Swiss-Prot record:
HAMAP family: Transaldolase_3b. PROSITE patterns: TRANSALDOLASE_1. GO terms for cellular component: cytoplasm. This is Probable transaldolase. The keyword Transferase applies. Keywords: Cytoplasm, Pentose shunt, Schiff base, Transferase. It comes from the Bacteria. Its EC number is 2.2.1.2. InterPro entries: Aldolase_TIM, TAL/FSA, Transaldolase_3B, Transaldolase_3B/F6P_aldolase, Transaldolase_AS, TSA/FSA_arc/bac.
Amino acid sequence: MKVFIDSGDIAEIKEAQSMGVVDGVTTNPSLLAKAGKPTKRAIAEICEVVDGPVSAEVVAVEKDAILREGRELAKIHRNVVVKVPLIDEGLKAARIFASEGIKTNVTLCFSAAQALLAAKAGATYVSPFVGRVDDAAGDGMDLVLQVVTIFRNYGFSTQVLTASIRHPVHFVQAAMIGSHAATMPLKVIKQLTRHPLTDVGLAQFLADAKKIPELV
């Protein structure tokens, strides 16, 4: 499963990249606003750091406007993936982007039916939001399972990019289900490296190492 970092902060992205585990980046207007840089500049900088897909989101809800913004974003770098909302107009735009060779990440997916339509429209990725589904008293991982199963049943090339991952359990469950990729903030990536027994074992090894006689 590919690991993406969900961030617009170049320092966070570089830190995650230094671990050698990051395959791509997802951003959204909220994350880029926190970075305090113009969108095109921020995306260009991210593309210089990570040699993988970088999702950049349009801020439009009408097909022609989505197409205009998306085409401009796609010009920034060959790795840019245009994020479009999972609405009627977004699907119309995704279909045209696909015909133009522009990769898309159809985002804000909350049902398997939505995901199926996104795949039929030619989306490169579809992003089911597991954490937000859980917040609404649903089962986010069951949604991912449904989407993965449907895509396998019908041989869709669209990849499942599990989003809104809140903790390591979400990450492991997504991998077990067969999600193609998962995106998460740096905080969760760091949580994945930690385990209390690792800390205990390391502390013991370091303590025992001090007992080894030094060679003269």
